[in-house]
Amino acid sequence: MSDRIDRDVINALIAGHFADPFSVLGMHKTTAGLEVRALLPDATDVWVIEPKTGRKLAKLECLDSRGFFSGVIPRRKNFFRYQLAVVWHGQQNLIDDPYRFGPLIQEMDAWLLSEGTHLRPYETLGAHADTMDGVTGTRFSVWAPNARRVSVVGQFNYWDGRRHPMRLRKESGIWELFIPGAHNGQLYKYEMIDANGNLRLKSDPYAFEAQMRPETASLICGLPEKVVQTEERKKANQFDAPISIYEVHLGSWRRHTDNNFWLSYRELADQLVPYAKWMGFTHLELLPINEHPFDGSWGYQPTGLYAPTRRFGTRDDFRYFIDAAHAAGLNVILDWVPGHFPTDDFALAEFDGTNLYEHSDPREGYHQDWNTLIYNYGRREVSNFLVGNALYWIERFGIDALRVDAVASMIYRDYSRKEGEWIPNEFGGRENLEAIEFLRNTNRILGEQVSGAVTMAEESTDFPGVSRPQDMGGLGFWYKWNLGWMHDTLDYMKLDPIYRQYHHDKLTFGMLYNYTENFVLPLSHDEVVHGKKSILDRMPGDAWQKFANLRAYYGWMWAFPGKKLLFMGNEFAQGREWNHDASLDWHLLEGGDNWHHGVQRLVRDLNLTYRHHKAMHELDFDPYGFEWLVVDDKERSVLIFVRRDKEGNEIIVASNFTPVPRHDYRFGINQPGKWREILNTDSMHYHGSNAGNGGAVHSDEIASHGRQHSLSLTLPPLATIWLVREAE
């Protein structure tokens, strides 16, 4: 019988260098009849078994002591179901032969994957528990077109790459194999001989769960059930909705006090979710929770884009957290990182021995600042991997929005590069046309497939139309972070009040471009690290003035057009920079009422008042929703404006950014009547000096600032006040 199989083929198969195992293993028609061949290292005896009766049909002959068996089934001409009875170390085991099953991926799926238009590639690629021909197991599929051989290794086969080599689908470059008996919870990887002949162990790019660092294996895990979007969650993302985002790093929001260990997803559901709800926030934004090897990356260098990190629990635990947030009325935003990935050898880098996911030229494919690799967006399968991932988090976990990280680094080829360190596009320009098309396509698909979910761009340049529709030349994001506003206003606030009059335009300039994008006003994690100090510590003056400045700034921010974002700890004025390895300084809220409690109460009241009054959020992106009343009083550092809703109801916002109270400050108004003070950052409730206007003030028919009626107010020191007109 040995003449039927070439000895070189057997040697290559056993050595793990044979690329087409299905041409040899399994059941085949030969001139001698139906022949079954199996590679079973360490086996001593093998029989072909009839599943229904358990009858032994034939004993396979050992053609190679390293585990290659073959035998002809007598009196059989047509293929049939069979099992193998295998003796290992004196123990007989009944197994199903992986090599008796046909191709796994349907032709249409293979076509769409190759074309890069498969909306949900994760439903085909990766590891999926399945039943084939009555046999339960797991089907594995991985894209590695340049690999010479790929095997599945894991807890089900002693991590032995000889035991389960995969079938290559040449039309798509995908390797596939159904392994009977492999089940949810088992660890696995792909072992491959790469394009250069090197042996590699790779995690599954499409793994739904992964081991916690420093381990790097993937886990077989069922695809999560779809989460249905609700109308309430859709409405909470709309342009006219109040959006106040609490940005959180799950690993350092709060830790166990006895061992400084993280809270689990379920503990966070029980503690973080009710806290954010009580504080009045509408959205939770999570720094990336994709699996990542390095804690210090904060999640922004992911290796498991489809797997929630195991640091805080399982995939189901994360689903529990999301469900708890939704039950509390909070939408969830996930920081999403399609811009780059780390160089770790177990992940995407040189996946099949070639630059499969990244560009080959480091001038296109390497981030010097972060020591990471840049996705090749022009490769259809790569962009499909990323677009599918966006849909995956929204559809399978109920994520309500994706905040896309570092967009500027994606859309500019010369981002953080000197001359000669980057390659122009085909037209000689600096724009990364493939990345731009990828972002437009992603936003288009999300708009079509999961209407109601939105995307937000962290984009640090003046690239036009980031949050404008694709048919208008835009990128199609729903919102864009206003980093210019953030830098200008923080630069202003850190000044001694005596010098602020010379930088008045830092607070007014934002309105000159306010309606070019749909802006979010971010005080994010990036502003409290790397020596920048905390937001509180940037404020000038003694302790009283620092807190007063911060309260005035928050009052200004919550009133200014744009959605709001505040990083954790800033809501109670944490004094030190953020440390990802430690809990927030919750002890600042212990030991009785203090300034930190005052800021915390203010942020809560800002959220609740902002949400209650439509004028503060309904027309953020419509010029009718805002009007300056006093814009040029730079000598006294006073700014006053109106926020307006669709029905014309107004709220007056007045800020005094000096420590000098301004008594009898008169300015013109649009609507005469009684104006009630609904928020005062100088209130004693927030540990201010309690200067103000006695709760309400009536307008006078005295012309001022070109208007027939006016108000005369007391503007408290270093404070912002909000007033609403009461009905007659």
From Swiss-Prot:
Annotated pathway: Glycan biosynthesis; glycogen biosynthesis
Active site (UniProt): D405 (nucleophile), E458 (proton donor)
EC numbers for this chain: 2.4.1.18
Entry keywords, A to Z: Carbohydrate metabolism, Glycogen biosynthesis, Glycogen metabolism, Glycosyltransferase, Transferase
Reaction(s) catalysed by this chain's protein: Transfers a segment of a (1->4)-alpha-D-glucan chain to a primary hydroxy group in a similar glucan chain
GO cellular component: cytosol
Annotated Pfam families: Alpha-amylase (PF00128), Alpha-amylase_C (PF02806), CBM_48 (PF02922), GlgB_N (PF22019)
InterPro entries on file: A-amylase/branching_C, Branching_enzy, GlgB, GlgB_N, GlgB_N_E_set_prok, Glyco_hydro_13_cat_dom, Glyco_hydro_13_N, Glyco_hydro_b
Uppermost EC category: transferase
Subunit and partners: Monomer.
Record-stated family: Belongs to the glycosyl hydrolase 13 family. GlgB subfamily.
Protein name, UniProt field: 1,4-alpha-glucan branching enzyme GlgB
Originating species: Escherichia coli O6:K15:H31 (strain 536 / UPEC)
Lineage: Bacteria, Pseudomonadati, Pseudomonadota, Gammaproteobacteria, Enterobacterales
Name of the gene: glgB
